[in-house]
């Protein structure tokens, strides 16, 4: 993950990478100290984003709220001391289920965002043909606290060095939202690593309008 993304960050000036889990950063520091220092420079430059806030991704249904908050506090303390930044979001792309307390927990911890793709795994639609209420919007908790939700569909999508403005799949998805905007993860799921070079090249072309 470190080496592949450091390569992409050096090769593509518009490439930005999000990575979660304080414990994984601690492992980087312990086992790959040279690459860890290179990564820290990209954090400072705003191109490697610390996501997720917590020490590690966690289930949100079984653990107590106190456990959830302590996980976030531990992660944020590590990020402040090691990287000089704090995360602003809860990032759970591969967590099964989200408790109704999540917006309240996020707000209590000073977080403003929440992102996942897991709602797309539902067997039955949420309403109509959709498996989730919206792709980008505010999720309001029972106490009135809210968090910005960005739902990215599946997390293993790859682009084959194509013109994304002509991608029929993206165009159809964008019609399903009031803002005509679609939010997507892209990259490599489960095994770590990075997006493919072709995927990054596709996004670079889109940014440049090519």
Predicted region positions:
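Catalytic-domain carbohydrate-binding cleft regions of carbohydrate-active enzymes
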Residues: 1-210
């Amino acid at each position: 993950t470190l080496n592949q993304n450091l390569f992409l960050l050096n090769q593509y000036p518009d490439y930005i990478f999000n990575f979660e889990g304080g414990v994984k950063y601690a492992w980087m520091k312990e086992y790959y100290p040279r690459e860890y220092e290179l990564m820290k420079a990209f954090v400072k430059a705003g191109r490697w984003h610390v996501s997720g806030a917590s020490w590690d991704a966690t289930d949100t249904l079984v653990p107590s709220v106190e456990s959830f908050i302590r996980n976030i506090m531990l992660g944020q303390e590590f990020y402040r001391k090691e990287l000089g930044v704090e995360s602003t979001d809860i990032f759970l792309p591969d967590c099964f289920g989200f408790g109704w307390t999540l917006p309240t927990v996020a707000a209590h911890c000073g977080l403003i965002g929440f992102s996942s793709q897991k709602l797309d795994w539902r067997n039955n639609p949420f309403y109509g043909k959709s498996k989730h209420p919206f792709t980008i919007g505010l999720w309001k908790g029972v106490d009135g606290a809210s968090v910005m939700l960005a739902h990215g569909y599946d997390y293993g999508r790859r682009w084959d060095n194509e013109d994304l403005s002509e991608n029929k799949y993206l165009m159809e998805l964008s019609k399903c939202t009031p803002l005509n905007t679609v939010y997507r993860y892209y990259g490599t799921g489960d095994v770590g690593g990075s997006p493919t070079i072709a995927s990054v090249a596709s996004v670079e072309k889109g940014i440049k309008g090519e």
